Each structure stands twice: as C-alpha cells, then as structure tokens.
UniProtKB/Swiss-Prot annotation:
GO molecular function: FAD binding; UDP-N-acetylmuramate dehydrogenase activity
Catalytic activity reported: UDP-N-acetyl-alpha-D-muramate + NADP(+) = UDP-N-acetyl-3-O-(1-carboxyvinyl)-alpha-D-glucosamine + NADPH + H(+)
Domain FAD-binding PCMH-type: 33-197
Superkingdom: Bacteria
Purpose: Cell wall formation.
Pfam families: FAD_binding_4, MurB_C
Gene3D superfamilies membership: 3.30.465.10, UDP-N-acetylenolpyruvoylglucosamine reductase, C-terminal domain (3.90.78.10), Uridine Diphospho-n-acetylenolpyruvylglucosamine Reductase, domain 2 (3.30.43.10)
Pathway as given in its UniProt record: Cell wall biogenesis; peptidoglycan biosynthesis
Catalytic EC class: oxidoreductase
Cellular compartment(s): Cytoplasm
Name of the molecule in the record: UDP-N-acetylenolpyruvoylglucosamine reductase
UniProt source species: Macrococcus caseolyticus (strain JCSC5402)
HAMAP family registered for this protein in UniProt: MurB
Amino acid sequence: MELHTIVDQLKKSIQSEHIKINEPLKKYTYTKTGGNADIYIMPTSYTEVQAALNIARQNDIPVTFLGNGSNIIIRDGGIRGIVISLLNLTKIRVHGHSITASSGAAIIDVSRIARDHHLTGLEFACGIPGSVGGAVFMNAGAYGGEIKDVIDHALVINHEGEIISLDNQALELDYRTSIIQKEHFVVLEASFKLAPGDIQSIQSQMDILTERRESKQPLEYPSCGSVFRRPPGHFAGKLIQDAQLQGHTIGGVQVSEKHAGFIVNVNEGTATDYENMIAHIQETVYKNSGIALETEVRIIGEPL
C-alpha cells in the first residue's frame, strides 16, 4: 500500500503536525546516526498509540517504537513502515510514596521529581539518559541500582492491542532484559514504589553519582552509552582496554580514550562505522581473551 494512503488513515486519529514522511532518524539518536523512517509519528495519548497500532496491523505494516534514542543504533538505510516516537507522552504523577510516569518521560526527570518529593530509591537513575519506557524495556541500571528494585507495575500494550498491567514479577526483569523485550510489548507507563527519605541525603547521593559519571564517561561526544553487556566476572571496558583498542578509530567513530566501553562519534560517523567497530572489538577481544562480548545496545533498521 502507498505511504500516503497509510498517512491519510493515521490523520484520522493523529494531528498532521505529528506525522512526518521520510523523516531523518539521526535527529533523534544519541549517536547522531541513522537513516530515514518511512513514516514517523508522535502520538500525544495512549489512545493515539493504540489507533496507530491498529492501522499498522490492518495494513500489515511493520511498527518500530522509539524512546529518546539513547541506547540504540539505527542503521543507515533507515526503518521501513511506521516509527512511533513516545516522546510526547511525558506525564509524571506523584501519589504518596509512588510515582507514575508515562513512557516518554526522561527517567532522569523522574529521579529529580522523586528527590523533590523527599522520595528515595531512584538516585541511581539520576544520570541514565533514557526514557521510562526504555528503562523498563531493558531494566536499566547504574551504580548498584536497577529498575527491578523500584518498579511496582507497568501498563503495556499486548499483542492483541489491549492495555494490560504487569506487576514487578510479571515483567520478568533481569540483567538488561524484560518480558517487554521478549514479547515485543509496548510500555505506556510505569509506577515506581519508593520510600520516604531526607532530601539532602538524596541530593548528596545524586551528586556523588553525577560526579562519578562525568569523570569516567565521555559525555562530550555523541555515543550510545554502554555498547556491550557485562560478561560474568569481567568488565567489557577492561577487556577492550587490554586488547589495546582504546582510541582505535574506524571511519568517524572511536573507542573512547576516556572509557573503553563507549564508542563515540568524533567525526560525522555513520551507523555502518559503529557496526564495523563493534564487530572489530568483538573479534579482537575474543582473540585476546577468549571472551565473547555481547551487545547491550540495540541495533535496528536496514543497511544501505
């Protein structure tokens, strides 16, 4: 079916200004790479998300969901079908010792609002550059904390297009994985169960973690964050460093000289450069240590 026909159907449920055709996705990724989306939409309600999914299902059109593009590499050929951005869904509500946040809200903002309401438990998330939906999707974590520790439940869209609630156990959260990944569900919102705390102590902990992050991570360059999962008993960055790859460059991307676990875009690098670098790192580290590195970053889309 022609794209304009799909767009006409989408316009019945979603405002025209929130629908784009042949949209460059590098505008929305932390790596500043990626090709174009056939159709890119930005729903402003859960009902609009459901409507878009129904249209895609009826027309057998593939759908890809994007949060804030922090831990993802979109290939240079872009993404076919409909890309649904959840970044217009940013509502955050505080009720007692709990916070409920829509999928597109920044997890950093949720941690700050928790602090402002004297609630402890989300300090670890004060520097995670991801959306709430992405954080649940991959059970995001840092400095000893993870989403699994604090999430009470999430509202998700299942395969039938129904909105259902999954509690902590049903989410099957584990190291950088969840039932959301396995079943390709869509997170609409998440509720976090926190505890009362002292605002000065909370801020102090956040300051410590922020200083640690800024001193160790190459925040001055575009990157996708941690590229590789942590191998049991090892650290990916140390293995890469031991393989003499720190500072190594392919095309416009480089293994960060500040933290070897990061690949930074130093000179208009492409997604192909990122993929080539990842493959080179995996091959070299395996030859050097016998350890196979697995990617943490999601790689999606079509090659050129």
